[in-house]
A protein has these predicted regions:
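Conserved pre-catalytic core of RNA-dependent polymerases
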Residues: 114-116, 166-167, 174-175
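Polymerase palm active-site segment centered on the conserved acidic dipeptide of motif C
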Residues: 168-171, 245-251
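Well-ordered alpha-helical segments embedded in enzymatic catalytic cores
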Residues: 98, 155-158, 218-222
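Structured helix-beta-strand junction loops
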Residues: 109, 165-166
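Reverse-transcribing Pol proteins
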Residues: 20-151, 231-247
């Protein structure tokens, strides 16, 4: 599930737990179809690029992000109550095991920490295309009390127009997406979420926070502004597209 799909679900009035449960079967069928067409690293990556394999290594990317100017701030409206609570969603036995594993891994990486926050948002799991479970926080209550960040996302028609002279394309995706951005120091407790095993707060961005897309786009625009100025690199959220008229500038 993409950030955009989750943001759309998060705006609906129906319980997102119910909505996402309805999509499980479709996701499983889609994953089965994808599994039939999986290719090896050598099949997917041209030989001249294989020396960069370490750059895309999953373990190499699991590190706590540095403090940056674009750290995600959660600014609450002046009339926000001093506390709010939530219910706990029921879990299956498999989800309970996944929760314990998730908490262990996230604590080890520093992505979450135990919390004593007066705020508590609910959470549940959804099944990803690869069959694994992903934690999802239901931040609708918090989002309704958050000052909105109006930083714009790129307009799709403008991005497409920049590709008009390109003949060679390469698409890159940022691993772990939102987890590459810290929560601003002092704002972690505002994003606290209640689990069946306790209360925790995020130290990095997760799905569902209302201003996450704007924060992430700010980071990407800042880091890649020089490359984007050439017109041969276009970026939308965690998707990077290198588009050139021939091989020379592409390499």
């Amino acid at each position: 599930m993409t950030e955009e799909e989750w943001e759309e679900i998060n705006q609906q009035e129906e319980d997102p737990y119910t909505i996402l449960r309805k999509t499980t079967t479709a996701s499983e069928l889609a994953q089965k179809a994808m599994d039939k067409t999986k290719k090896t690293f050598e099949q997917m990556v041209p030989e001249e690029y294989r020396r960069h394999a370490r750059t895309f290594n999953e373990k190499e990317s699991q590190r706590f992000p540095l403090e940056r100017p674009w750290d995600h701030a959660i600014e609450l409206l002046p009339d926000t109550p001093k506390s709010f609570d939530c219910k706990i969603y029921p879990m299956t036995a498999g989800e309970d095991d996944s929760l314990r594993e998730f908490i262990r891994e996230q604590l080890e990486k520093g992505y979450i920490q135990p919390s004593k926050s007066p705020y508590a948002s609910p959470f549940f799991f959804i099944k990803k295309k690869d069959g694994k479970l992903r934690l999802v926080q239901d931040y609708r209550k918090l989002n309704s009390l958050t000052v909105k960040n109006q930083y714009p996302l790129p307009l799709i028609p403008e991005l497409i127009d920049k590709l008009r002279n390109a003949t060679l394309f390469m698409k890159l995706d940022i691993r772990w997406g939102y987890n590459n951005v810290r929560i601003k120091e002092g704002d972690q407790e505002k994003g606290a979420f209640k689990t069946n095993l306790g209360l925790y707060e995020p130290c990095v961005m997760f799905f569902g926070l209302t201003n996450s897309p704007s924060t992430f786009q700010t980071m990407m625009d800042t880091i890649f502004q020089d490359l984007m100025a050439t017109g041969e690199v276009v970026i939308y959220m965690d998707d990077i597209l290198i588009a050139t008229p021939n091989n020379t500038p592409h390499h």
